Swiss-Prot record:
Source domain of life: Bacteria
Organism: Bacillus cereus (strain ATCC 14579 / DSM 31 / CCUG 7414 / JCM 2152 / NBRC 15305 / NCIMB 9373 / NCTC 2599 / NRRL B-3711)
Name of this chain's protein: UPF0145 protein BC_1816
Pfam families per UniProt: YbjQ_1 (PF01906)
Family listed: Belongs to the UPF0145 family.
InterPro entries in the record: UPF0145_dom_sf (IPR035439), UPF0145_YbjQ-like (IPR002765)
Taxon lineage: Bacteria, Bacillati, Bacillota, Bacilli, Bacillales
Length: 103
């Protein structure tokens, strides 16, 4: 499945605009991981624990969105948007949305 942030796909004609599709993932933050991430930030390293959590949550949300688009008969998603939000108690939410299309 083609997934893009653009409003179209170069060289492809959109045959049908199907529906808006989305996916969400909420991940809890581990307190020990948070502590080590903070220490790495202070000494100038990258916060690998946070990066890993972000990637995992984004992948889950994207997979959910793609599956929904596939169920609706789409073979591409255009105009995707990815949003990150920290919700209460250190939980991380990743929400993705886009327009399911058939090309």
């Amino acid at each position: 499945m083609i997934v893009t942030t653009t409003s179209g796909i170069q060289g492809k004609e959109i045959i049908e605009y199907i529906d808006i599709v989305n996916g969400e993932a909420i991940m809890g933050a581990n307190i020990v991981r948070d502590l080590f991430a903070s220490v790495r930030d202070v000494v100038g390293g990258r916060a690998g624990a946070y990066e890993s959590k972000l990637k995992d949550a984004r992948d889950i949300a994207m997979d959910e969105m793609k599956e929904l688009a596939k169920q609706k008969g789409a073979n591409a998603i255009i105009g995707i948007d990815v949003d990150y939000e920290v919700v209460r108690d250190g939980m991380l939410m990743v929400a993705v949305s886009g327009t399911a299309v058939r090309i």
